[in-house]
Amino acid sequence: MRLQGVRKEDIMTTAPRIARLIRPLVVALALAGVPALALTSASSATATTCATTVAHWGSLTKSLSRMTSAPITNVRAGRNACFDRMVVDLRGKGAGYTVRYVPQVLTQGQGAVIPLRGGAKLDIVVKAPTYNINTGTSTYHPANSRELVNVTGFSTFRQIASGGSFEGYTTIGLGVRARLPMRVFILDGPGTGSRVVIDVAHHW
């Protein structure tokens, strides 16, 4: 392959000259203790920084006042590079929520304390039932009400427990490592369903 406008002899004479210019710079950086990939590493670190100071993140109460009769069908959780996520699945749309840090999470209707592992506790109230309001038939059947999801190995989550469902309100207790930034939002789908999403950051 021939490069237009560039002669072979130009390349042969220019390459050593460039090498002589670069070598002192590399040596100087090494003596200064700067790794060769420092700039690349810094750039990569900036790109992967977890932005928990932007809008919607924080440790104060998050709420949405609307309510729905669309029932809850599942609770699940997953891990992200910057946060742990809990998802409440609903068979329909329109759910509201109140999520806040509290000294103790109490069950719906009875007010009994829910024991939770972790240095801080999130009281999650989803404004939707876990049953069909017309028939009373349960729509969510966890195998263990004290361990709705196995969160072993999670960075922030320590325990997810049921607080029951009463008069269209459902409580879930989330034990976390410490009082860390969180955000809550609604996602539509799949299909005609929707999801209440709670993210809790790994760090401030």
Task: Label the model's feature ranges.
Residues 8-47:
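Secretory targeting and sorting signals
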Residues 44-204:
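Short linear recognition/processing motifs and adjacent strand/loop elements at protein termini
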